[in-house]
Amino acid sequence: MRSFLISGILALGLMATGPIALAQDATTKYVRFSHDGRTGFGILDGTTITALDGDPITGAKPTGKTIALDSVELLPPSDAGKVFAVGMNFASHISSASDRPPPLFLKLPTSLTGTGSDVSLPPDANNVHFEGELVLIIGKRARNVSEADAMDYVFGLTAGNDLTERSWQGRDLQWMRAKATDGFGPVGPALVTGLDANNVLLTTRLNGEIVQQENTRNMIHKPAKVVSYLSRYFTLSPGDMIFMGTPGRTSALDDGDVVTVTIEGIGTLTNRIVR
């Protein structure tokens, strides 16, 4: 699957060179990866990763060491302690009222998997649907923040696929099994700063065919509203993720299907479904 991974990143390879700048005044791509048995962070420039001495969200600097992209396994781009999600956030999918609180649910850190990885379905998961989504990644502790200040607490963006078992979703009391099963939260390929969360194009493909495509400007509950609302009830910590909802129609996946989620400026998240 590594060929999917590399081509997806290069397709939209925006990168700011030079010293790392956590002020987010430029577009920069950060990746989290496994290499030679170790987990690290780096800045992606084309097919080269410049290794960092720590997590860019909490503070890091380049080490000067470079690593070839095709020699690493890309992991979820942050070490998320909490994974929130918004439902019914596009009228083209299922809409909710803009003057009401955003509908929320949780995924689990163990739901997360990186680009290029296979998603192995439980044997009784027979109605799993793709849901391509924009994902916010929190940059600093947030509690009771205003909507006006909320985006100051977002470090950057990535792409996600909120895989969902529709039969379980309709039958179970809670959505935990349907939404938070291991592997049901692919994210990546990179954590990107400097993008406008309210204006990026999201495209989902199933086996190369476009099945979802919409601009995030059409989100009903905007990122600032969601971050502010969540922070009333939950402490948001650096690295936490917020899935922002899916547009359009979804459909069930079969063994061997390849789902890609492309967001302009971020790149392409690619995963294969395996039974």
Enumerate the predicted regions with their spans.
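Positively charged n-region of N-terminal signal peptides that target proteins for export
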Residues: 1-4
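Bacterial N-terminal signal peptides
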Residues: 7-17
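N-terminal non-catalytic cap/leader segment that marks the start of a structured domain
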Residues: 8, 22-102, 125, 195-199, ...
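A generic local secondary-structure boundary/capping motif
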Residues: 73-75, 94, 119-128, 142-149, ...
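Structural signature of FAD isoalloxazine-binding scaffolds in flavoprotein oxidoreductases
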Residues: 101-115, 130, 260-264
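RNA pseudouridine synthases
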Residues: 135-138, 144-160
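Catalytic-pocket segment enriched in acidic/His residues
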Residues: 166-275
